[in-house]
Swiss-Prot record:
EC number: 2.1.1.-
Protein name, entry field: Ribosomal RNA small subunit methyltransferase, mitochondrial
Enzyme class, first EC level, given as a word: transferase
One Pfam family in the UniProt entry: RrnaAD
Keyword rRNA processing: yes
Transit peptide: 1-26
Catalysed conversion reaction: adenosine(1914)/adenosine(1915) in 18S rRNA + 4 S-adenosyl-L-methionine = N(6)-dimethyladenosine(1914)/N(6)-dimethyladenosine(1915) in 18S rRNA + 4 S-adenosyl-L-homocysteine + 4 H(+)
GO molecular function annotation: RNA binding; rRNA (adenine-N6,N6-)-dimethyltransferase activity
Any one GO cellular component localisation term in the record: mitochondrion
Lineage: Eukaryota, Viridiplantae, Streptophyta, Embryophyta, Tracheophyta
């Protein structure tokens, strides 16, 4: 009987210890949970719009993911972006999409002036008040317009957290625009950054990369986790630095862009296969004839950067063309064959090779740009 009572007492003691331990463990777990960044807790249960509170600046601001409104909140990363930008005390910095001013405040401390382009009126009001409260109002110029439709004033550098949904056209505007600048340090979607960094032979080498790198060098700076943003996007980001080249190739930009659109429309096909297709032959014949005053109807151009279509070698298309078109096609293929390009693929070619091929075509009277079009298409 005494032994049984001792056993029962031990069981109760062990049970009590286990219960107390569980309480301590749960308390520690809750304590650890409270040390996690605020955005880790806020991210749960939100779909599109997220309400955030920044204690000193504003209360109850709704951010829309569909408009690319993701605020970078990590001070360490903000400092790293500013350091990697090599800002001089005399510089004017262009910031695109400043939001509530987390990066703007850092830029104002380092540069002489900051020009911030922001479309959202709410953000403009918050930014203006925040900057004024910190005594930087005379160093900041705010342009409340759509950045893609705005003529930029003079600037020396670009430092910006770019909205994901305008990355391609904005990079195009910067590198092929009329403004001269030293560099652009951009926070972009990680996948988009990888595409910009891609080189010939890489699986993701694409038309955007080949066009940007014609006139600028692109350098990787660092990766940034999606957890560092409020609200957190679905994907991670990267910081890259774009530096315009001092010397660029002597090539007609519109002709080059049209040429790369043709080549990278089916970038993994051989050039011989691509230029044997009846539709492509007729299109090039029309565009080339238009340079000589011909009234030949210009066919609609096809674009894209996809290899999803079924590959056609086009060997029998020659029988379907009239005499002039057949002669034109033979001229195109002869240029490719004679210069060793017939079996090569655009995704493997360097800038030097692409420029050489375009020069050979133009010298033979074969052109790619529709002279009636004024649109500059840099990206897919």
């Amino acid at each position: 009987m005494i032994l049984r009572l001792k056993d029962q007492t031990l069981i109760k003691i062990n049970s009590t210890r286990s219960y107390l331990s569980s309480l301590v463990f749960r308390r520690d777990s809750h304590s650890q949970a409270r040390t996690k960044p605020d955005h880790d807790r806020r991210r749960r249960g939100y779909e599109r719009d997220v309400r955030i509170e920044e204690k000193k600046e504003h209360d109850g601001l709704f951010l829309c993911k569909s408009k690319g409104q993701h605020l970078l909140t990590n001070t360490r990363i903000l400092d790293s972006i500013v350091r990697s930008s090599d800002i001089r005390p005399t510089d004017t910095v262009l910031e695109i999409g400043p939001g509530t001013g987390n990066l703007t405040m850092k830029l104002l401390e380092a540069a002489q002036n900051v020009v911030a382009v922001e479309l959202d009126k709410r953000m403009v009001e918050i930014l203006r008040k925040r900057v004024s409260d910190h005594g930087f109002a005379d160093k900041l110029t705010i342009i409340q317009k759509d950045v893609l439709k705005t003529d930029f004033p003079h600037f020396d550098l670009v430092v910006a957290n770019i909205p994901y949904n305008i990355s391609s056209p904005l990079v195009a505007k910067l590198v092929y625009g009329s403004n001269t600048f030293r560099s652009a340090t951009l926070l972009l979607q990680k996948e988009f950054s990888r595409r910009l960094l891609a080189n010939p032979g890489d699986s993701d080498f694409n038309r955007l990369a080949v066009n940007v790198k014609l006139v600028a060098d692109v350098k990787f700076v660092m990766d940034v986790s999606k957890r560092e943003f409020v609200p957190p996007p679905k994907v991670d980001s990267s910081v890259i630095r774009i530096t315009p080249k001092e010397i660029i190739p002597d090539v007609n930009v519109q002709e080059w862009l049209a040429f790369t659109r043709t080549c990278f429309g089916k970038k993994n096909k051989t050039l011989g296969s691509m230029f044997r297709q009846k539709k492509k032959v007729m299109e090039l014949q029309s565009l080339s004839a238009g340079r000589h005053g011909s009234n030949v109807e210009v066919m609609n151009q096809t674009g894209g950067d996809s290899d999803s279509d079924v590959e056609e070698d086009g060997k029998d298309d020659l029988l379907c063309l009239d005499t002039d078109a057949s002669m034109f096609k033979e001229r195109v293929i002869e240029i490719l064959r004679t210069n060793g390009f017939e079996e090569k693929r655009p995704s493997k070619l360097s800038h030097r090779e692409l420029l050489h091929l375009l020069s050979l075509f133009n010298q033979a009277g074969i052109f790619f740009h529709d002279i009636t079009s004024l649109q500059m298409d840099l990206h897919e």
